[in-house]
């Protein structure tokens, strides 16, 4: 897994402007998102591998619902500008090259910017139960964006 994360990290820095990956399909988990997002699953942890890696692309203002991951999550920001909000912490600006670590069971969401797309690679140890929670309201999203100013 360390080798996978290192490879993904190097890829993220080297290609932060021009993604060498297809953005994927309209996100099949769209019921847990507001707005349009795309998903390209690189590795679904099949074949005995213990990590899942996916590219998620967010259109402007699109975002996940609040959620948690029982084993945490690593986000490697590849392009654009967005935001990650972990409950009880200051909002994190998601810009190319940023590596954002989300602890186990931390309530959080990730999003594109108000006028910008954002693409990240998500890496999670498997199995890793995701618990989907409430939607992030427009007012809540705007408030989180103001934290970045």
Regions found by a protein language model. Give the residues of each.
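Glycine- and acidic-residue-biased ligand/ion/polar-headgroup-sensing regions
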Residues: 70-82, 87-88
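Ligand-binding loop in jelly-roll beta-barrel domains
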Residues: 83, 104-130
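Conserved short histidine dyad/triad with adjacent acidic residue
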Residues: 52-69
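Short acidic-glycine-tyrosine-enriched beta hairpin
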Residues: 88-105
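Structural recognition of the beta-strand scaffold that forms the well-ordered cores
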Residues: 66, 74-76, 101, 120-122
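A short, N-terminal "cap"/entry segment at the start of jelly-roll beta-barrel domains
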Residues: 4-6, 10, 15-50, 130-149
């Amino acid at each position: 897994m360390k080798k996978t994360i290192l490879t993904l990290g190097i890829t993220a820095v080297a290609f932060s402007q021009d993604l060498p990956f297809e953005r994927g399909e309209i996100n099949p988990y769209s019921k847990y998102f507001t707005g349009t997002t795309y998903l390209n699953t690189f590795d679904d942890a099949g074949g005995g591998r213990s990590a899942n890696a996916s590219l998620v692309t967010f259109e402007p203002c699109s975002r996940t619902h609040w959620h948690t991951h029982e084993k945490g999550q690593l986000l490697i920001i590849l392009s654009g500008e967005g935001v990650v909000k972990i409950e009880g912490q200051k909002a994190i600006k998601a810009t190319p090259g940023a590596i954002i670590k989300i602890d186990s069971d931390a309530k959080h969401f990730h999003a594109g910017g108000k006028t910008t797309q954002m693409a990240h690679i998500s890496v999670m140890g498997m199995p890793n139960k995701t618990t989907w929670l409430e939607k992030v309201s427009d007012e809540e999203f705007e408030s989180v964006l103001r934290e970045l100013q």
